Protein backbone atom coordinates (compact mmCIF):
# COMPACT_ATOMS: atom_id res chain seq x y z
CA UNK A 1 0.00 0.00 0.00
CA UNK A 2 1.14 3.54 -0.77
CA UNK A 3 1.39 5.69 2.33
CA UNK A 4 -0.85 8.49 1.05
CA UNK A 5 0.21 10.91 3.78
CA UNK A 6 3.83 10.74 2.66
CA UNK A 7 2.88 11.05 -1.00
CA UNK A 8 1.21 14.44 -0.92
CA UNK A 9 2.75 17.72 -1.95
CA UNK A 10 1.90 21.29 -2.88
CA UNK A 11 2.29 23.29 -6.09
CA UNK A 12 5.31 25.59 -5.95
CA UNK A 13 5.28 26.95 -9.53
CA UNK A 14 3.07 26.90 -12.63
CA UNK A 15 4.37 27.79 -16.11
CA UNK A 16 1.63 27.08 -18.64
CA UNK A 17 1.10 23.31 -18.75
CA UNK A 18 4.23 22.66 -16.62
CA UNK A 19 3.73 22.35 -12.87
CA UNK A 20 6.44 22.11 -10.19
CA UNK A 21 5.39 20.27 -7.04
CA UNK A 22 7.18 20.23 -3.68
CA UNK A 23 6.81 17.17 -1.49
CA UNK A 24 7.26 17.59 2.24
CA UNK A 25 9.18 14.37 2.91
CA UNK A 26 11.92 12.88 0.75
CA UNK A 27 9.44 10.32 -0.63
CA UNK A 28 9.12 11.61 -4.19
CA UNK A 29 6.93 10.10 -6.93
CA UNK A 30 8.71 8.16 -9.67
CA UNK A 31 9.22 9.59 -13.16
CA UNK A 32 6.08 8.93 -15.31
CA UNK A 33 3.85 8.56 -12.23
CA UNK A 34 0.48 10.27 -12.47
CA UNK A 35 -0.12 12.95 -9.85
CA UNK A 36 -3.53 14.51 -9.23
CA UNK A 37 -4.00 18.17 -8.28
CA UNK A 38 -7.09 19.04 -6.27
CA UNK A 39 -8.25 22.40 -7.63
CA UNK A 40 -11.50 22.47 -5.69
CA UNK A 41 -14.03 22.31 -8.52
CA UNK A 42 -11.88 20.00 -10.69
CA UNK A 43 -9.10 17.45 -10.54
CA UNK A 44 -6.09 17.95 -12.84
CA UNK A 45 -3.89 14.95 -13.71
CA UNK A 46 -0.21 15.55 -14.50
CA UNK A 47 2.66 13.21 -15.38
CA UNK A 48 5.99 13.51 -13.58
CA UNK A 49 8.79 14.22 -16.07
CA UNK A 50 11.77 15.35 -14.00
CA UNK A 51 13.08 15.13 -10.43
CA UNK A 52 14.56 18.56 -9.68
CA UNK A 53 16.16 17.94 -6.28
CA UNK A 54 15.20 19.63 -2.99
CA UNK A 55 12.08 17.40 -2.84
CA UNK A 56 10.69 18.98 -6.02
CA UNK A 57 9.37 17.32 -9.18
CA UNK A 58 8.40 18.84 -12.52
CA UNK A 59 5.25 17.49 -14.16
CA UNK A 60 3.35 18.11 -17.39
CA UNK A 61 -0.41 18.54 -17.23
CA UNK A 62 -2.78 16.36 -19.29
CA UNK A 63 -5.60 18.91 -19.08
CA UNK A 64 -5.81 22.69 -18.86
CA UNK A 65 -4.04 24.28 -15.88
CA UNK A 66 -6.48 27.22 -15.82
CA UNK A 67 -7.57 28.00 -12.28
CA UNK A 68 -4.67 26.26 -10.53
CA UNK A 69 -2.78 28.20 -7.90
CA UNK A 70 0.36 27.83 -5.83
CA UNK A 71 -0.14 25.92 -2.63
CA UNK A 72 -2.83 23.63 -4.06
CA UNK A 73 -2.71 20.05 -2.76
CA UNK A 74 -1.19 17.32 -4.96
CA UNK A 75 -1.53 13.54 -4.54
CA UNK A 76 0.80 10.91 -6.03
CA UNK A 77 -1.26 8.01 -7.41
CA UNK A 78 1.72 5.64 -7.17
CA UNK A 79 1.51 4.47 -10.79
CA UNK A 80 1.51 5.84 -14.36
CA UNK A 81 -1.74 6.96 -16.02
CA UNK A 82 -3.95 3.84 -16.08
CA UNK A 83 -6.57 3.36 -18.80
CA UNK A 84 -9.49 0.91 -19.22
CA UNK A 85 -8.94 -2.06 -21.57
CA UNK A 86 -10.94 -4.91 -23.09
CA UNK A 87 -14.27 -5.35 -24.88
CA UNK A 88 -16.09 -2.57 -22.90
CA UNK A 89 -13.84 -0.02 -24.69
CA UNK A 90 -15.26 -0.92 -28.14
CA UNK A 91 -17.54 1.67 -29.70
CA UNK A 92 -16.49 4.28 -27.13
CA UNK A 93 -14.42 7.49 -27.31
CA UNK A 94 -11.79 8.15 -24.64
CA UNK A 95 -9.40 10.94 -23.78
CA UNK A 96 -5.72 10.48 -22.87
CA UNK A 97 -6.64 9.55 -19.27
CA UNK A 98 -9.00 6.78 -20.40
CA UNK A 99 -12.09 8.76 -19.43
CA UNK A 100 -15.10 8.35 -21.79
CA UNK A 101 -15.92 11.62 -23.59
CA UNK A 102 -18.89 10.42 -25.68
CA UNK A 103 -21.61 11.11 -23.05
CA UNK A 104 -22.62 7.44 -22.98
CA UNK A 105 -21.89 6.97 -19.29
CA UNK A 106 -18.91 5.32 -17.57
CA UNK A 107 -16.87 2.54 -19.17
CA UNK A 108 -17.41 -0.64 -17.17
CA UNK A 109 -14.04 -2.20 -17.90
CA UNK A 110 -12.96 -4.78 -15.33
CA UNK A 111 -9.28 -4.06 -15.72
CA UNK A 112 -6.93 -1.21 -16.51
CA UNK A 113 -3.32 -1.01 -17.65
CA UNK A 114 -0.62 1.66 -17.20
CA UNK A 115 0.28 3.48 -20.43
CA UNK A 116 4.03 3.08 -19.78
CA UNK A 117 4.93 -0.57 -20.30
CA UNK A 118 7.99 -2.40 -21.63
CA UNK A 119 8.02 -3.61 -25.24
CA UNK A 120 7.65 -7.41 -25.71
CA UNK A 121 10.90 -9.27 -25.02
CA UNK A 122 12.91 -10.71 -27.88
CA UNK A 123 11.79 -14.29 -27.09
CA UNK A 124 8.10 -13.32 -27.37
CA UNK A 125 8.40 -11.88 -30.87
CA UNK A 126 7.24 -13.70 -33.97
CA UNK A 127 10.26 -13.89 -36.24
CA UNK A 128 8.79 -15.20 -39.52
CA UNK A 129 7.47 -12.34 -41.66
CA UNK A 130 3.94 -12.93 -42.94
CA UNK A 131 1.67 -10.85 -45.16
CA UNK A 132 -1.40 -9.31 -43.55
CA UNK A 133 -4.20 -9.73 -46.12
CA UNK A 134 -6.54 -6.73 -46.25
CA UNK A 135 -8.88 -7.80 -49.07
CA UNK A 136 -8.00 -4.61 -50.96
CA UNK A 137 -6.45 -5.54 -54.35
CA UNK A 138 -4.05 -2.64 -54.83
CA UNK A 139 -2.66 -2.95 -51.29
CA UNK A 140 -2.29 -6.75 -51.12
CA UNK A 141 -0.75 -7.01 -54.57
CA UNK A 142 1.57 -3.99 -54.91
CA UNK A 143 2.41 -2.82 -51.37
CA UNK A 144 1.45 -5.69 -49.02
CA UNK A 145 1.23 -5.02 -45.28
CA UNK A 146 3.34 -6.98 -42.83
CA UNK A 147 1.52 -8.69 -39.98
CA UNK A 148 2.68 -6.73 -36.95
CA UNK A 149 4.32 -4.13 -39.17
CA UNK A 150 4.09 -0.37 -39.46
CA UNK A 151 2.59 1.30 -42.50
CA UNK A 152 2.83 4.98 -43.40
CA UNK A 153 -0.29 6.48 -44.98
CA UNK A 154 0.49 9.54 -47.10
CA UNK A 155 -2.22 11.73 -48.59
CA UNK A 156 -3.65 15.22 -48.55
CA UNK A 157 -7.19 16.25 -47.71
CA UNK A 158 -10.08 14.70 -49.63
CA UNK A 159 -8.32 11.78 -51.32
CA UNK A 160 -10.09 9.05 -49.35
CA UNK A 161 -7.84 8.45 -46.32
CA UNK A 162 -10.76 8.12 -43.88
CA UNK A 163 -12.71 5.73 -46.11
CA UNK A 164 -9.60 3.54 -46.57
CA UNK A 165 -9.08 3.49 -42.79
CA UNK A 166 -12.72 2.50 -42.18
CA UNK A 167 -12.55 -0.26 -44.83
CA UNK A 168 -9.44 -1.71 -43.17
CA UNK A 169 -11.21 -1.65 -39.77
CA UNK A 170 -14.20 -3.44 -41.33
CA UNK A 171 -12.09 -6.06 -43.15
CA UNK A 172 -9.87 -6.97 -40.19
CA UNK A 173 -13.01 -7.63 -38.15
CA UNK A 174 -14.58 -9.84 -40.83
CA UNK A 175 -11.55 -11.70 -42.19
CA UNK A 176 -9.30 -11.90 -39.13
CA UNK A 177 -11.80 -11.65 -36.25
CA UNK A 178 -9.71 -8.72 -35.07
CA UNK A 179 -10.47 -5.30 -33.64
CA UNK A 180 -9.04 -1.84 -34.19
CA UNK A 181 -7.99 1.06 -32.02
CA UNK A 182 -7.94 4.56 -33.50
CA UNK A 183 -5.64 7.13 -31.89
CA UNK A 184 -6.46 10.68 -32.94
CA UNK A 185 -3.25 12.54 -32.08
CA UNK A 186 -3.47 16.33 -32.30
CA UNK A 187 -5.99 16.38 -35.14
CA UNK A 188 -9.02 18.66 -35.61
CA UNK A 189 -12.01 18.04 -33.33
CA UNK A 190 -14.29 18.37 -36.37
CA UNK A 191 -12.43 15.52 -38.11
CA UNK A 192 -12.78 13.33 -35.03
CA UNK A 193 -16.49 14.06 -34.90
CA UNK A 194 -16.90 13.35 -38.64
CA UNK A 195 -15.04 10.04 -38.31
CA UNK A 196 -17.27 8.99 -35.39
CA UNK A 197 -20.42 9.88 -37.36
CA UNK A 198 -19.19 8.00 -40.47
CA UNK A 199 -18.27 4.95 -38.38
CA UNK A 200 -21.77 4.84 -36.92
CA UNK A 201 -23.30 5.24 -40.38
CA UNK A 202 -21.23 2.42 -41.88
CA UNK A 203 -21.86 0.16 -38.82
CA UNK A 204 -18.19 -0.01 -37.82
CA UNK A 205 -19.61 1.27 -34.52
CA UNK A 206 -22.87 -0.49 -33.58
CA UNK A 207 -24.90 2.00 -31.54
CA UNK A 208 -27.48 -0.60 -30.49
CA UNK A 209 -24.95 -3.17 -29.24
CA UNK A 210 -21.67 -1.41 -28.52
CA UNK A 211 -19.85 -4.70 -27.79
CA UNK A 212 -20.37 -5.66 -31.46
CA UNK A 213 -18.42 -2.57 -32.56
CA UNK A 214 -15.09 -3.11 -34.28
CA UNK A 215 -13.13 -0.13 -32.97
CA UNK A 216 -12.24 1.87 -29.86
CA UNK A 217 -11.43 5.57 -30.32
CA UNK A 218 -8.93 7.61 -28.32
CA UNK A 219 -8.74 11.34 -29.02
CA UNK A 220 -6.25 13.99 -27.96
CA UNK A 221 -7.15 16.88 -30.24
CA UNK A 222 -5.10 19.90 -31.25
CA UNK A 223 -6.73 22.25 -28.70
CA UNK A 224 -5.47 20.11 -25.81
CA UNK A 225 -2.21 20.68 -23.89
CA UNK A 226 0.97 19.19 -25.40
CA UNK A 227 1.16 16.61 -22.59
CA UNK A 228 -2.14 15.07 -23.69
CA UNK A 229 -1.15 15.03 -27.36
CA UNK A 230 2.20 13.44 -26.50
CA UNK A 231 0.63 10.62 -24.47
CA UNK A 232 -2.60 9.86 -26.35
CA UNK A 233 -0.72 7.56 -28.75
CA UNK A 234 0.44 5.48 -25.75
CA UNK A 235 -3.14 5.31 -24.42
CA UNK A 236 -4.37 3.91 -27.75
CA UNK A 237 -1.39 1.52 -27.94
CA UNK A 238 -2.06 0.20 -24.42
CA UNK A 239 -5.68 -0.62 -25.34
CA UNK A 240 -4.42 -2.39 -28.49
CA UNK A 241 -1.82 -4.38 -26.48
CA UNK A 242 -4.54 -5.84 -24.27
CA UNK A 243 -6.45 -7.19 -27.29
CA UNK A 244 -3.18 -8.69 -28.60
CA UNK A 245 -1.75 -10.14 -25.38
CA UNK A 246 -4.86 -11.16 -23.41
CA UNK A 247 -7.54 -11.70 -26.08
CA UNK A 248 -4.89 -13.05 -28.50
CA UNK A 249 -6.34 -11.14 -31.46
CA UNK A 250 -4.95 -9.41 -34.52
CA UNK A 251 -5.26 -5.68 -33.91
CA UNK A 252 -5.07 -2.68 -36.23
CA UNK A 253 -3.77 0.47 -34.57
CA UNK A 254 -4.32 3.74 -36.41
CA UNK A 255 -2.29 6.76 -35.40
CA UNK A 256 -3.54 9.94 -37.02
CA UNK A 257 -1.18 11.84 -36.98
CA UNK A 258 2.32 10.58 -36.11
CA UNK A 259 3.80 14.02 -36.91
CA UNK A 260 1.61 15.62 -34.21
CA UNK A 261 3.06 13.14 -31.70
CA UNK A 262 6.55 14.42 -32.54
CA UNK A 263 5.32 18.02 -32.49
CA UNK A 264 3.81 17.60 -29.01
CA UNK A 265 7.05 16.02 -27.78
CA UNK A 266 8.92 19.03 -29.14
CA UNK A 267 6.63 21.43 -27.23
CA UNK A 268 7.01 19.48 -23.98
CA UNK A 269 10.78 19.29 -24.43
CA UNK A 270 10.98 23.09 -24.82
CA UNK A 271 8.72 23.63 -21.79
CA UNK A 272 11.00 21.40 -19.71
CA UNK A 273 14.00 23.48 -20.76
CA UNK A 274 15.83 20.91 -22.93
CA UNK A 275 18.30 22.19 -25.50
CA UNK A 276 16.65 21.90 -28.94
CA UNK A 277 18.19 19.67 -31.60
CA UNK A 278 18.08 19.97 -35.42
CA UNK A 279 15.27 22.21 -36.80
CA UNK A 280 14.14 22.89 -33.23
CA UNK A 281 13.05 19.33 -32.47
CA UNK A 282 13.60 17.67 -29.10
CA UNK A 283 17.02 16.01 -28.58
CA UNK A 284 15.23 12.79 -27.55
CA UNK A 285 13.23 12.53 -30.81
CA UNK A 286 14.63 9.14 -31.89
CA UNK A 287 14.20 7.68 -28.39
CA UNK A 288 10.58 8.84 -28.01
CA UNK A 289 9.69 7.50 -31.44
CA UNK A 290 11.49 4.21 -30.70
CA UNK A 291 9.67 3.69 -27.38
CA UNK A 292 6.30 4.01 -29.15
CA UNK A 293 7.21 2.00 -32.27
CA UNK A 294 8.95 -0.91 -30.51
CA UNK A 295 5.73 -1.78 -28.67
CA UNK A 296 3.93 -2.14 -32.03
CA UNK A 297 4.81 -5.67 -33.12
CA UNK A 298 3.75 -9.31 -33.64
CA UNK A 299 4.15 -11.73 -30.76
CA UNK A 300 3.49 -15.46 -30.53
CA UNK A 301 0.01 -14.60 -29.19
CA UNK A 302 -1.27 -12.00 -31.67
CA UNK A 303 -0.24 -8.93 -33.61
CA UNK A 304 -0.57 -5.17 -33.69
CA UNK A 305 -0.35 -3.84 -37.22
CA UNK A 306 -0.09 -0.08 -37.19
CA UNK A 307 -1.17 2.36 -39.88
CA UNK A 308 0.22 5.83 -39.29
CA UNK A 309 -0.78 8.93 -41.18
CA UNK A 310 2.40 10.82 -42.02
CA UNK A 311 2.44 14.56 -42.65
CA UNK A 312 5.55 15.81 -44.41
CA UNK A 313 6.22 19.44 -43.38
CA UNK A 314 6.70 21.62 -46.49
CA UNK A 315 7.09 18.37 -48.50
CA UNK A 316 10.63 18.05 -47.09
CA UNK A 317 11.33 14.34 -46.64
CA UNK A 318 14.63 15.13 -44.90
CA UNK A 319 12.86 16.93 -42.03
CA UNK A 320 13.79 15.06 -38.80
CA UNK A 321 10.14 14.17 -37.98
CA UNK A 322 9.27 12.21 -41.17
CA UNK A 323 12.87 10.98 -41.52
CA UNK A 324 12.73 9.40 -38.04
CA UNK A 325 9.32 7.88 -38.85
CA UNK A 326 10.55 6.35 -42.13
CA UNK A 327 13.21 4.38 -40.25
CA UNK A 328 10.42 2.35 -38.60
CA UNK A 329 8.05 1.80 -41.55
CA UNK A 330 7.65 -1.56 -43.33
CA UNK A 331 5.37 -0.24 -46.08
CA UNK A 332 4.03 3.03 -47.45
CA UNK A 333 0.58 3.62 -48.93
CA UNK A 334 0.55 6.82 -50.97
CA UNK A 335 -2.83 8.27 -51.94
CA UNK A 336 -2.87 10.18 -55.23
CA UNK A 337 -5.04 13.20 -55.97
CA UNK A 338 -4.71 12.43 -59.70
CA UNK A 339 -6.32 9.01 -59.29
CA UNK A 340 -9.03 10.42 -57.00
CA UNK A 341 -9.90 13.05 -59.62
CA UNK A 342 -10.30 10.23 -62.19
CA UNK A 343 -12.78 8.57 -59.82
CA UNK A 344 -10.49 5.60 -59.14
CA UNK A 345 -10.98 4.57 -55.50
CA UNK A 346 -9.11 3.55 -53.42
CA UNK A 347 -6.80 6.24 -54.86
CA UNK A 348 -3.64 4.33 -53.88
CA UNK A 349 -0.75 5.23 -56.17
CA UNK A 350 0.55 1.87 -57.49
CA UNK A 351 3.97 3.29 -58.47
CA UNK A 352 4.72 5.39 -55.38
CA UNK A 353 3.48 2.92 -52.73
CA UNK A 354 6.19 0.56 -51.45
CA UNK A 355 6.61 -2.43 -49.15
CA UNK A 356 9.57 -4.34 -47.74
CA UNK A 357 7.38 -7.47 -47.96
CA UNK A 358 7.37 -7.44 -51.77
CA UNK A 359 10.23 -9.93 -52.13
CA UNK A 360 9.99 -13.31 -53.90
CA UNK A 361 11.29 -15.12 -50.77
CA UNK A 362 8.36 -13.76 -48.72
CA UNK A 363 5.38 -13.41 -51.08
CA UNK A 364 6.37 -16.08 -53.62
CA UNK A 365 7.63 -15.74 -57.18
CA UNK A 366 4.19 -15.59 -58.85
CA UNK A 367 2.98 -12.69 -56.67
CA UNK A 368 6.28 -10.84 -57.08
CA UNK A 369 6.38 -11.31 -60.87
CA UNK A 370 2.75 -10.17 -61.24
CA UNK A 371 3.38 -7.04 -59.15
CA UNK A 372 6.47 -6.18 -61.21
CA UNK A 373 4.57 -6.64 -64.50
CA UNK A 374 1.77 -4.35 -63.27
CA UNK A 375 4.28 -1.68 -62.28
CA UNK A 376 6.18 -1.95 -65.58
CA UNK A 377 2.94 -1.63 -67.59
CA UNK A 378 1.77 1.39 -65.59
CA UNK A 379 5.22 3.01 -65.74
CA UNK A 380 5.31 2.64 -69.54
CA UNK A 381 1.80 4.14 -69.75
CA UNK A 382 2.98 7.07 -67.63
CA UNK A 383 5.94 7.65 -69.97
CA UNK A 384 3.67 7.57 -73.04
CA UNK A 385 1.12 10.03 -71.64
CA UNK A 386 3.02 13.11 -72.87
CA UNK A 387 3.20 11.71 -76.40
CA UNK A 388 -0.51 10.82 -76.30
CA UNK A 389 -1.37 14.35 -75.07
CA UNK A 390 0.55 16.00 -77.94
CA UNK A 391 0.16 13.59 -80.88
CA UNK A 392 -2.75 11.35 -79.92
CA UNK A 393 -3.04 7.56 -79.55
CA UNK A 394 -2.85 6.90 -83.30
CA UNK A 395 0.80 7.96 -83.48
CA UNK A 396 1.88 5.14 -81.14
CA UNK A 397 3.27 1.82 -82.35
CA UNK A 398 1.05 -1.28 -82.24
CA UNK A 399 2.86 -2.59 -79.14
CA UNK A 400 2.55 0.72 -77.29
CA UNK A 401 -1.16 0.97 -78.13
CA UNK A 402 -1.66 -2.48 -76.64
CA UNK A 403 0.35 -1.49 -73.53
CA UNK A 404 -1.79 1.64 -73.08
CA UNK A 405 -5.00 -0.36 -73.50
CA UNK A 406 -3.92 -2.93 -70.90
CA UNK A 407 -2.57 -0.25 -68.53
CA UNK A 408 -5.91 1.60 -68.57
CA UNK A 409 -7.68 -1.67 -67.76
CA UNK A 410 -5.17 -2.42 -64.97
CA UNK A 411 -5.68 1.09 -63.55
CA UNK A 412 -9.45 0.57 -63.47
CA UNK A 413 -9.17 -2.99 -62.16
CA UNK A 414 -7.15 -1.66 -59.20
CA UNK A 415 -10.31 0.21 -58.12
CA UNK A 416 -12.71 -1.64 -55.85
CA UNK A 417 -16.13 -1.09 -54.22
CA UNK A 418 -15.83 -0.76 -50.42
CA UNK A 419 -18.19 -2.19 -47.79
CA UNK A 420 -18.16 1.06 -45.82
CA UNK A 421 -19.01 3.08 -48.95
CA UNK A 422 -22.12 0.99 -49.76
CA UNK A 423 -24.22 3.63 -48.02
CA UNK A 424 -23.00 6.29 -50.47
CA UNK A 425 -22.43 4.35 -53.72
CA UNK A 426 -25.24 1.81 -53.62
CA UNK A 427 -22.92 -0.93 -54.95
CA UNK A 428 -22.06 -3.82 -52.57
CA UNK A 429 -18.53 -3.94 -51.16
CA UNK A 430 -16.07 -6.64 -52.21
CA UNK A 431 -13.32 -8.48 -50.31
CA UNK A 432 -10.86 -9.93 -52.85
CA UNK A 433 -8.46 -12.66 -51.74
CA UNK A 434 -4.81 -12.33 -52.74
CA UNK A 435 -4.93 -15.46 -54.94
CA UNK A 436 -7.92 -14.09 -56.87
CA UNK A 437 -6.10 -10.77 -57.36
CA UNK A 438 -2.95 -12.45 -58.71
CA UNK A 439 -4.98 -14.69 -61.03
CA UNK A 440 -7.07 -11.79 -62.38
CA UNK A 441 -4.14 -9.48 -63.12
CA UNK A 442 -2.08 -12.28 -64.66
CA UNK A 443 -4.85 -13.13 -67.10
CA UNK A 444 -5.40 -9.45 -67.87
CA UNK A 445 -1.71 -8.84 -68.62
CA UNK A 446 -1.50 -12.01 -70.72
CA UNK A 447 -4.03 -10.48 -73.11
CA UNK A 448 -6.95 -12.76 -72.24
CA UNK A 449 -9.32 -9.79 -71.94
CA UNK A 450 -8.00 -7.46 -74.65
CA UNK A 451 -11.44 -7.51 -76.29
CA UNK A 452 -13.35 -6.43 -73.15
CA UNK A 453 -14.23 -2.72 -72.72
CA UNK A 454 -12.34 -0.63 -70.13
CA UNK A 455 -15.41 0.23 -68.08
CA UNK A 456 -16.08 -3.46 -67.33
CA UNK A 457 -13.01 -3.42 -65.02
CA UNK A 458 -14.08 -0.31 -63.09
CA UNK A 459 -15.21 -0.79 -59.47
CA UNK A 460 -15.49 -4.58 -59.49
CA UNK A 461 -14.12 -7.27 -57.16
CA UNK A 462 -12.44 -10.24 -58.86
CA UNK A 463 -11.98 -10.90 -62.58
CA UNK A 464 -15.18 -12.96 -62.90
CA UNK A 465 -17.19 -9.87 -61.98
CA UNK A 466 -15.41 -7.90 -64.72
CA UNK A 467 -16.31 -10.63 -67.26
CA UNK A 468 -19.94 -10.61 -66.08
CA UNK A 469 -20.04 -6.79 -66.24
CA UNK A 470 -18.66 -6.86 -69.81
CA UNK A 471 -21.36 -9.35 -70.86
CA UNK A 472 -23.97 -7.09 -69.28
CA UNK A 473 -22.61 -4.03 -71.12
CA UNK A 474 -22.70 -5.90 -74.44
CA UNK A 475 -26.16 -7.33 -73.76
Swiss-Prot record:
A molecular-function term among this protein's GO annotations: proton-transporting ATP synthase activity, rotational mechanism
Entry keyword set: ATP synthesis, ATP-binding, CF(1), Chloroplast, Hydrogen ion transport, Ion transport, Membrane, Nucleotide-binding, Plastid, Thylakoid, Translocase, Transport
EC number of this enzyme: 7.1.2.2
Subcellular compartments: Plastid, Chloroplast thylakoid membrane
Primary location group: plastid
Amino acids binding ATP: 155-162
Record SMART domains: AAA (SM00382)
GO cellular component: chloroplast thylakoid membrane; mitochondrion; proton-transporting ATP synthase complex
Enzyme class: translocase
GO biological process, one term: proton motive force-driven mitochondrial ATP synthesis
Membrane topology of this protein: Peripheral membrane protein
Domain of life where this protein originates: Eukaryota
Catalysed reactions, as listed in the record: ATP + H2O + 4 H(+)(in) = ADP + phosphate + 5 H(+)(out)
NCBIfam families given in the database record: atpD
Assembly notes: F-type ATPases have 2 components, CF(1) - the catalytic core - and CF(0) - the membrane proton channel. CF(1) has five subunits: alpha(3), beta(3), gamma(1), delta(1), epsilon(1). CF(0) has four main subunits: a(1), b(1), b'(1) and c(9-12).
Similarity comment: family membership: Belongs to the ATPase alpha/beta chains family.
PANTHER family: ATP SYNTHASE, ATP SYNTHASE SUBUNIT BETA, MITOCHONDRIAL
Function: Produces ATP from ADP in the presence of a proton gradient across the membrane. The catalytic sites are hosted primarily by the beta subunits.
HAMAP family hit by this protein: ATP_synth_beta_bact
Protein name: ATP synthase subunit beta, chloroplastic
Source taxonomy: Eukaryota, Haptista, Haptophyta, Prymnesiophyceae, Coccolithales
Amino acid sequence: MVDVASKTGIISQIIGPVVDVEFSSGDLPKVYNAIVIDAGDKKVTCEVQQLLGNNKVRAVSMTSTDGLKRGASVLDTGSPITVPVGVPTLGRIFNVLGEPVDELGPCNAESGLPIHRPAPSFTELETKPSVFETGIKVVDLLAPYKRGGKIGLFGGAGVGKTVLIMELINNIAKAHGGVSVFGGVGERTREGNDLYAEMKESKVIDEDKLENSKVALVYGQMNEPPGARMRVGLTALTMAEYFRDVNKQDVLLFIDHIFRFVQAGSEVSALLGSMPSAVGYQPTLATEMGVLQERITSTNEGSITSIQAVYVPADDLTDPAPATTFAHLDATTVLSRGLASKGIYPAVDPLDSTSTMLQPEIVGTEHYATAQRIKETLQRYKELQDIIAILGLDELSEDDRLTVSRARKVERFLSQPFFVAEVFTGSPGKYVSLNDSIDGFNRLLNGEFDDLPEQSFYLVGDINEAIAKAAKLKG
